[in-house]
Every structure is written in C-alpha cells, then in structure tokens.
Amino acid sequence: MPLLKAKPTSAGRRHVVQVVNPDLHKGAPYAPLLEKNSKSGGRNNNGRITVRHVGGGHKQHYRVIDFKRNKDGIPAKIERLEYDPNRSANICLVLYADGERRYILAPKGAKAGDQIQSGSDAAIKAGNSLPMRNIPVGTTVHAIEMKPGKGAQIARSAGQYAQILARAEGYVTLRLRSGEVRRVLADCRATIGEIGNAEHMLRSLGKAGANRWRGIRPTVRGVAMNPVDHPHGGGEGRTSGGRHPVSPWGVPTKGKKTRSNKRTDKLIVRRRNK
C-alpha cells in the first residue's frame, strides 16, 4: 500500500503521512456486527481517574471480530476489506456458504473474492484457520490461541506474525516478533500467513490534535509539575531531586521489573529481546 505525504498547506498538515489502501470499503460497516463502544474517560465507577492520558476522541462503534474461527468445514468468501478504528489491522467481512457473515482480521494479500475456510482439513493457505497440530513446521501464522477454543490472543495487530519452530509432546514452539520463543498447546488454532497493513508503523499523525481524535490526552512530565503533584516536581530549573525515576505514586520505573510470575512461565523457552 502506498504512503501519501500531505502537502504542507498548513502547519498541521506539513508532517502528515497516511497509509492509502484503495481496496478498503468506502461505505458504512455491516450493522449487525456493530456494538456500542462507550468511553470511560479513564474513570472508574466512582468517577476517579484510574488510567491517565485518556479522554475525548471520536465516537466509534465496536466491530465484533471472530477470533475463534470455529465454523469448521464451511467455505467462506471475502466480500470486502474494511477500516477498523479500534485496531491497527484492517478487517474482512466474510460470507459463509450458510449465509452467515462475520468479521475477521485481514491477512496480508487478502482481497475481495478470496475463498477461506476453517477446520482441521483446511488447506495451508493465507487466511485459513486450523489447529496448529495440522500446520507444517516453518509456517508463518497469526491470530494464535493460547487456550483451545478461547479465541486468538497472540499476533493480532498490523504486520504481526509468529513462526512455528517445532512440534512435540502435544505442544508447538513459536517464535514471536518480539524474539520470545514459547510453547503453546498443539490443539490451539492459528491462521495461516501474517496480518496485513504492515505500513501502519510508517504513518505520521503530524499534529497533537490527531492524537486527541484517538482519545489520547497529553502526557505531562513529572519534572514540569509541582511537588504536590509528583515526586519529581518542584526545584529551581529541571531537577528530579537526585532520585531514580518513579511514577506519580512513587513506584520505581524505567527498568524496574513489574511482570508477576505466572504458572505459564514454564512455557516460555526464551525471553523476548530487550
């Protein structure tokens, strides 16, 4: 997909770089697969801010995505590709032979009219979903389950994929884009190929207001605050008081390990690249 650099007709347009995909549907989304998507403004049920830098943004409907791909043996045709404001990847509206329509993540190279299928006997072809025990070693996959039947949780954003390295003892070994190597049950499903719209990472919003459209509020540095607001606040000039970087609540940050140990840690063969 080509990248479009905006003409510098104003300061806000000067640095804008957009991803242009002429194959995306230009009309309204498929209404039966839309749900209300209320905004919280980062507040909990007491009205207190629990997540900073959240608020505003354009109204959006949530597109119900089929992450389970459990209509086995029923062929489907991709009707159209669509933009989804809730994720970096594009989505496909697929029509099954029994008349049902569903949204799925758009794999790389997908186009209207392509045939896809789910199930153990599906062909090894981009967009087809099947248990990883039936996928050859070395295949690139995306939309990977971590528990059989739960739905895809790994490799769901634009340009993402994982590679199957080995299969043994009821598990498959995957190498993720982060460099992490981990084992997943072989009965978990995955979709062949990689997610499309990899150029998403090359776009440039161009101005602060574009982030506000996405519901992202400004991030103020602690050293720019007063002492009452942040441990780094106050002082004459820029100084953090000689302490290590901390959050507004005094929790060490920038290097402090925050990941809790989990029972499934034993399935991680190699940690991700730093």
From Swiss-Prot:
- The annotated regions of Low complexity compositional bias extend over 39-48
Which SMART domains does the UniProt entry name for this protein? Ribosomal_L2 (SM01383), Ribosomal_L2_C (SM01382)
Family to which the UniProt record says this protein belongs: Belongs to the universal ribosomal protein uL2 family.
Q: Kindly list the GO CC terms recorded for this protein.
A: large ribosomal subunit
Q: In this UniProt entry, which cysteines form S-S bonds?
A: none
Protein's name in the database:
Large ribosomal subunit protein uL2
The biological process GO terms on file are: cytoplasmic translation
The UniProt GO MF terms for this protein read: rRNA binding; structural constituent of ribosome; transferase activity
Per the entry, what this protein does is: One of the primary rRNA binding proteins. Required for association of the 30S and 50S subunits to form the 70S ribosome, for tRNA binding and peptide bond formation. It has been suggested to have peptidyltransferase activity; this is somewhat controversial. Makes several contacts with the 16S rRNA in the 70S ribosome.
Specify the species: Pseudoalteromonas atlantica (strain T6c / ATCC BAA-1087)
> What is the protein's quaternary organization?
Part of the 50S ribosomal subunit. Forms a bridge to the 30S subunit in the 70S ribosome.
Alphabetical list of Pfam families matching this protein: Ribosomal_L2, Ribosomal_L2_C
Spans annotated as Disordered:
28-53, 223-274
Q: Which domain of life is it from?
A: Bacteria
Q: Which UniProt keywords apply?
A: Ribonucleoprotein, Ribosomal protein, RNA-binding, rRNA-binding
> InterPro entries of this UniProt entry?
NA-bd_OB-fold, Rib_uL2_dom2, Ribosomal_uL2, Ribosomal_uL2_bac/org-type, Ribosomal_uL2_C, Ribosomal_uL2_CS, Ribosomal_uL2_dom3, Ribosomal_uL2_RNA-bd_dom
